[in-house]
Amino acid sequence: MKPEIIIMLTNNDITVKNAEEVFESCKDLPAKKWGFKDVGLPKDEMIKLAAKMKEAGKETYIEVVTYTEEGCLEGAKLAYECGFDYLTGALPFDSVFEYAKEHNLKYSPFCGKVGGSPVELTGSIDEIVSSAKECIEKGADGVDLTAYRYADGDPIELTKAIVDAIG
């Protein structure tokens, strides 16, 4: 697996107000994956920015940080309505998987026990690896691993375990 970076135009789990300006100043960088959160910009600005990213040849990502099934499904609908390629975050509810599949959205849900804002990841490494495997078995295109906010152990050890388990 070749690691790739996703440039997220966010700060403290909120899209920065000048996200469009930041993107315009950096769009010629070789990074191909760009995104932002579902909070911080009005929907019309999200649509416009996602379109600009695609026009620049970028893959687009929206990360949804919510923990109810209703909120996660609303996030999936927002991802589709704004024209994103990928939905990341949200919890792996069956309804979100179904919506993503029906609307050709690639989906990488949170794995492990996540909560709070900013997000905190808790649980044992084995529990988080098991959760990641379950997400992939359900049809996820990847997982959203918030290793840098892992509260119960070594984030490097966790990341290595996830890569070993699901690639």
Regions found by a protein language model. Name each.
Residues 2-60, 65-167:
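Alpha/beta enzyme core
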